[in-house]
C-alpha cells in the first residue's frame, strides 16, 4: 500500500493550482509512495487541462462531478472514497506544501504511530493561520492538554482507516464550516494525535477573489454545524466529565474566535432574532452543567443564548465592551454582575488582564514620554486608577510614575530622568509595567508588545550625567515577549561621543558607538574663561548640532570644559 493520498478539491483554480502541483512534483519522497487525487467541482476554466499536464510527473487520479456541488465537501468525499494511501492529506487547490512535507511526515508517523498528524502551517500574502498549537513538535497531544481544538480545518494528515472505519466524511448538505465537524470527529476517534512543528510544512495562501472554501452561510446552517459538533462530543466514547471539558473548551473557542463573537453589536437589529434563534438551538444542545466549565465571562452569554433572549444577550456584550454594568461589585478579585433590573446576578466572573497598547514612546536625555491605551478591559473608566511601574529585573527595586495626562483613555506618563536617575544605578535592567488598580485589586501588565511603530532604531540611547559619572540609558524590546525595558550602564564619555567644530559657530556632536538623543533647545559650552550660548537641535539619531551665538576659535574649541543642555551638564575635562 502506498503511504499517502493527497486529496485536492478544485473549482476554477487555473490561476494558482500550478503552484500546488509543482510543490507536489518536487517532493523529496518516492513518487510511487503517494498519489494525488483531484476531484473537480465542474470548473468552467482551464483547471483540468492544467492538471492533466502533470500526468508524467505525478501519480494522478482525476475526476469531475456531474453537477456543481457548491462547496468542497462532496469533492473531498469522492476523493476520500477513491484514496488508496495509508494516510490522506487534504490540500486546498490555492495552497501548496513544503518539498519535505511527505518525507518528514512519513518518518514521524512511522516512529510515533499517529492517527492524526497536524503539520505546521504558514500564512502567505497576509493569510492568517493557527499558530498556538505549533510551538513545538509533540508525539502525542489531546484536546485538553494542547491547543489543537483551535484548528479545525481539514488540512491535516489522517490515517485512512480512521476515517473510513468510523464513517467520517464531510456533510455534503452543508456548504461552510462542515470541515470543523469532520475534524472534530477525527480528533474524537483517534487513538493518537501528533503535532509536527519542525518547519513550515503547509503554506496557506491568500489569493485575490473567492477562496473555494469561503461562501456566505446562513446563521441556521452555521449553528447547525456547531450543534452537530456539540452532539458529536457528547456522544463520544469517553467519560462524561472528559466530554464536558472538551465541549467547554470548544465553546471557549467558538465564542472567542467565530462569527458569534460580538455578533449582537455588528449584525443589523432586524437580523438579530434570526441569529439568536439559531444560536439558541445550538446552545440548547449543551447541558447546563457545562456552563460551569467555560470561561466565566461566557456564562451570561450562554444563559441568554439558551433562552433566546436577544435583548439581554446584547446588553451583556455591550456591557463587556463599555465596562459599565447595571450593578456590579468585586469580591476576592472577581466580578459579580447584574446586567439588567430583575435579571440574575452572575457571580465569580474573572477579570481578565487588560491589553495595553503603547501608542507613543519618545525619550531624550531629560525625560521619557510614553502614551498607553487600555483595550478589552472589563472595567470601564472611572472605576480604576493607573500608574506606570519600573521594576528592576532582579525584583529588588521598584519606581512608580504617576499619570500625567488622561486624554480620552489615552494615558500619558512623563518619566523625568532627573527624578529617577539616583535610583537607576541600583540595577542595569528595568522592566516597564502598567498597573491598574480597582479598589484593593491590582492588575499588572507588561508594556510594549502591542505598539505603534517605534520611532528609533535599535540601540538608540540617551546620555545621563550622575554625580561625576556618565551612564547610557537604552530602551529595548525583550527577546522572548517583545516588551519594552530600559538598560542602564556606566560608560566613558569620550568613548561614546565626539565633538567637532564645523565652520566657526557650529559644534557637531556624534555618537561613536550608537545614536544618542538629546533634548532640543537652549545649550551652552563652557570654556576656560568664557561661556557661549547656543541652540541644540537633533539632526539625526546619530548627530546633534549646536549653533553657537558667536564664533569660536579652534584653539578655544579644544579647551571646552562643559557642555550644558537644558537639563543636563556634561563635564568634558
Swiss-Prot record:
One Gene Ontology MF term: metal ion binding
UniProt xrefs under InterPro entries: Glyco_trans_2-like (IPR001173), Nucleotide-diphossugar_trans (IPR029044), TarS/TarP_linker (IPR054028), TarS_C1 (IPR041038), TarS_C2 (IPR054531)
Domain of life from the UniProt record: Bacteria
Enzyme class: transferase
Keywords: Antibiotic resistance, Cell wall biogenesis/degradation, Glycosyltransferase, Manganese, Metal-binding, Teichoic acid biosynthesis, Transferase, Virulence
GO terms (BP aspect): cell wall organization; response to antibiotic; teichoic acid biosynthetic process
Any single Pfam family the record assigns to this protein: TarS_linker
Knocked-out gene: effects: Deletion mutant has no growth or cell division defects, but mutant shows increased susceptibility to beta-lactams. Deletion of the gene leads to the production of only alpha-O-GlcNAcylated WTAs.
Cofactors (names): Mn(2+)
EC number, UniProt record: 2.4.1.355
Active site, renumbered: 179
Pathway: Cell wall biogenesis; poly(ribitol phosphate) teichoic acid biosynthesis
Gene3D superfamilies: Spore Coat Polysaccharide Biosynthesis Protein SpsA, Chain A
Induction: Expression is up-regulated in the presence of beta-lactams.
Reactions it catalyzes: 4-O-[(D-ribitylphospho)(n)-di{(2R)-glycerylphospho}]-N-acetyl-beta-D-mannosaminyl-(1->4)-N-acetyl-alpha-D-glucosaminyl di-trans,octa-cis-undecaprenyl diphosphate + n UDP-N-acetyl-alpha-D-glucosamine = 4-O-([2-N-acetyl-beta-D-glucosaminyl-1-D-ribitylphospho](n)-di{[2R]-1-glycerylphospho})-N-acetyl-beta-D-mannosaminyl-(1->4)-N-acetyl-alpha-D-glucosaminyl di-trans,octa-cis-undecaprenyl diphosphate + n UDP + n H(+)
Chain positions recorded as UDP-N-acetyl-alpha-D-glucosamine binding sites: 9, 41, 68, 76, 92-94, 127, 178, 207, 211-213
Binding positions (Mn(2+)): 94
Function: Attaches beta-O-GlcNAc (beta-O-N-acetyl-D-glucosamine) residues to the C4 position of poly(RboP)-wall teichoic acids (WTAs). Prefers UDP-GlcNAc as a donor substrate and is specific for poly(ribitol phosphate) WTAs. Can also use UDP-Glc and UDP-GalNAc, but not UDP-galactose or UDP-glucuronic acid. Mediates beta-lactam resistance in methicillin resistant Staphylococcus aureus (MRSA) strains.
Additional free-text comment from the UniProt record: TarS is a unique target for compounds used in combination with beta-lactams to treat MRSA infections.
Family: Belongs to the glycosyltransferase 2 family.
Subunit structure as annotated in this protein's UniProt entry: Homotrimer.
Protein name: Poly(ribitol-phosphate) beta-N-acetylglucosaminyltransferase TarS
Gene that encodes the chain: tarS
Amino acid at each position: 500500500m502506498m503511504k499517502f493520498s493527497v486529496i485536492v478539491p478544485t473549482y476554477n483554480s487555473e490561476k494558482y493550482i500550478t503552484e500546488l502541483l509543482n510543490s507536489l512534483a518536487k517532493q523529496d519522497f518516492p513518487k510511487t509512495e503517494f498519489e494525488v487525487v483531484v476531484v473537480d467541482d465542474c470548473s468552467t476554466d482551464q483547471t483540468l487541462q492544467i492538471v492533466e499536464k502533470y500526468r508524467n510527473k505525478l501519480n494522478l487520479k482525476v475526476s469531475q462531478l456531474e453537477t456543481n456541488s457548491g462547496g468542497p465537501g462532496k469533492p473531498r468525499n469522492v476523493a476520500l472514497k477513491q484514496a488508496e494511501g495509508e494516510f490522506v492529506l487534504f490540500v486546498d487547490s490555492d495552497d501548496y506544501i513544503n518539498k519535505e512535507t511527505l518525507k518528514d511526515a512519513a518518518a514521524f508517523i512511522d516512529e510515533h504511530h499517529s492517527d492524526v498528524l497536524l503539520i505546521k502551517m504558514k500564512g502567505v500574502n497576509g493569510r492568517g493561520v493557527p499558530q498556538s498549537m505549533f510551538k513545538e513538535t509533540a508525539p502525542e497531544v489531546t484536546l485538553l492538554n494542547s491547543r489543537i481544538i483551535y484548528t479545525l480545518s481539514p488540512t491535516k494528515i489522517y490515517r485512512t482507516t480512521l476515517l473510513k472505519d468510523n464513517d467520517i466524511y464531510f456533510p455534503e448538505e452543508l456548504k461552510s464550516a462542515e470541515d470543523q465537524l469532520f475534524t472534530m470527529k477525527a480528533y474524537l476517534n483517534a487513538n493518537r494525535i501528533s503535532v509536527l512543528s519542525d518547519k513550515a510544512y503547509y503554506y496557506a495562501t491568500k489569493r485575490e477573489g473567492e477562496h473555494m472554501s469561503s461562501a456566505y452561510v446562513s446563521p441556521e446552517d452555521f449553528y447547525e454545524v456547531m450543534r452537530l459538533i456539540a452532539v458529536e462530543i457528547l456522544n463520544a466514547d469517553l467519560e462524561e466529565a472528559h466530554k464536558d471539558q472538551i465541549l467547554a473548551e470548544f465553546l471557549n473557542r467558538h465564542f472567542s474566535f467565530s462569527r458569534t463573537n460580538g455578533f449582537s453589536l455588528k449584525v443589523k437589529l432586524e437580523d438579530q432574532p434570526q441569529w439568536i434563534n439559531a444560536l439558541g438551538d445550538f446552545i440548547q444542545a449543551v447541558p447546563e452543567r457545562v456552563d460551569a466549565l467555560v470561561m466565566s465571562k461566557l456564562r451570561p452569554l450562554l444563559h441568554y443564548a439558551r433562552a433566546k433572549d436577544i435583548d439581554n444577550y446584547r446588553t451583556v456584550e455591550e456591557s463587556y465592551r463599555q465596562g459599565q454594568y447595571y450593578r456590579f461589585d468585586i469580591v476576592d478579585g472577581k466580578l459579580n454582575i447584574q446586567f439588567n433590573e430583575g435579571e440574575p446576578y452572575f457571580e465569580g466572573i474573572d477579570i481578565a488582564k487588560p491589553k495595553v497598547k503603547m501608542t507613543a514612546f519618545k525619550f531624550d536625555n531629560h525625560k521619557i514620554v510614553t502614551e498607553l491605551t487600555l483595550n478589552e478591559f472589563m472595567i470601564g473608566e472611572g472605576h480604576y486608577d493607573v500608574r506606570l511601574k519600573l521594576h528592576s529585573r532582579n525584583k529588588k527595586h521598584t519606581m512608580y510614575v504617576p499619570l500625567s495626562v488622561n486624554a480620552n483613555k489615552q494615558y500619558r506618563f512623563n518619566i523625568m530622568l532627573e527624578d529617577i536617575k539616583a535610583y537607576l544605578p541600583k540595577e542595569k535592567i528595568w522592566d516597564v509595567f502598567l498597573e491598574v488598580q480597582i479598589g484593593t485589586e491590582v492588575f499588572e501588565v507588561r508594556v510594549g508588545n502591542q505598539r505603534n511603530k517605534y520611532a528609533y532604531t535599535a540601540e538608540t540611547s540617551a546620555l545621563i550625567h550622575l554625580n561625576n559619572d556618565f551612564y547610557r540609558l537604552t530602551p529595548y524590546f525583550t527577546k522572548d515577549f517583545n516588551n519594552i525595558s530600559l538598560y542602564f550602564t556606566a560608560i566613558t564619555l569620550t568613548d561614546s561621543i565626539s565633538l567637532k567644530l564645523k565652520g566657526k559657530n557650529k559644534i557637531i556632536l556624534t555618537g561613536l558607538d550608537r545614536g544618542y538623543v538629546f533634548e532640543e533647545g537652549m545649550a551652552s559650552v563652557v570654556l576656560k574663561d568664557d561661556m557661549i550660548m547656543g541652540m541644540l537641535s537633533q539632526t539625526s539619531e546619530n548627530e546633534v548640532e549646536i549653533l553657537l551665538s558667536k564664533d569660536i576659535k579652534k584653539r578655544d574649541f579644544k579647551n571646552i570644559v562643559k557642555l550644558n543642555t537644558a537639563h543636563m551638564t556634561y563635564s568634558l575635562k
